[in-house]
């Protein structure tokens, strides 16, 4: 897929009640919809987003003020939107927004939900009950977590992310395995991620120097999520948009976004933040892919492109075995005909063989694998947008 330049609207904010039910894409794409998440999600069409990142209320169950040893008060989450009458009320709320998210998620889409020990297990239960299929749980290990000032529990140094596909048979979801492995020094990316909490210049502050949002997530966390599970041009939905981290990272990484938020101060902060983001260029956004993600090329395509002619003699890299290319795209050797893979296996006495890497052609006295010709075909397909 060719990268595209995304044009973002001058005004990001849309009012949920002014959008029609299942509004056209142009009415909500790259926008912040102001309103309750469930009612706002009704404005989006079925199967319209590729990835969802949700940072729902944690239902922290705080039993009073929390103080440091010097008696200064800890800034914790005590906003009205994080307060529920009971676990049953929280479960009903969770089920409602997850159902709404499931409707707008594409069949091959995935959802990420982040939470603490206060809520993530209840969210996980609802995800499974609604038919989502859990792919991974990711542990975000914080390099600079808040201490446990009362000394009555272990220091809470992580949060948990659940990554799930829309349904068990939801094949074709995006996972950029090779890119994640390459970014991790060619070692498989593990499910424990080490990031600092959001501090310093990245932390949004109001005119009084106070935090704009109590649970602002680090951009590095969202960047890894998007680089792992989406492609440039994909639509990322955040139903609890807050200070706009998802939108800012999506814009920088060439993804579309749609955020839902009901609190005007958060909307104002997110709008200013996103408008200040400069998207990366096409070259920087190219995602590394592996063999499985590359388009299939038939050996006959190499011949049809004139890169090999009937009668060409192929051999292995040590010139031990030889085969002749036939006009129908098969090879013949030792009186037997078949595909490049079958004949490669037969001449070696093996059960299987990758003919693309086994067979070589000669060019200017140098042997080259026919896989180099397949690469030329794939480059032509990419240039044509195939």
UniProtKB/Swiss-Prot annotation:
Described purpose of this protein according to its UniProt entry: CcrM-mediated methylation has important cellular functions. Contributes to the accurate cell-cycle control of DNA replication and cellular morphology.
Superkingdom, natural source: Bacteria
GO CC, alphabetical: cytoplasm
Lineage: Bacteria, Pseudomonadati, Pseudomonadota, Alphaproteobacteria, Hyphomicrobiales
Gene Ontology biological process: DNA replication; methylation
GO molecular function: DNA binding; N-methyltransferase activity; site-specific DNA-methyltransferase (adenine-specific) activity
Source species: Brucella abortus (strain S19)
Family: Belongs to the N(4)/N(6)-methyltransferase family.
One Pfam family named in its UniProt record: N6_N4_Mtase
InterPro entries per record: DNA_methylase_N4/N6, DNA_methylase_N6_adenine_CS, RAMA, RM_Methyltransferase, SAM-dependent_MTases_sf
SUPFAM superfamilies for this protein: S-adenosyl-L-methionine-dependent methyltransferases (SSF53335)
Protein name (database record): DNA methyltransferase CcrM
Keyword annotations: DNA replication, DNA-binding, Methyltransferase, S-adenosyl-L-methionine, Transferase
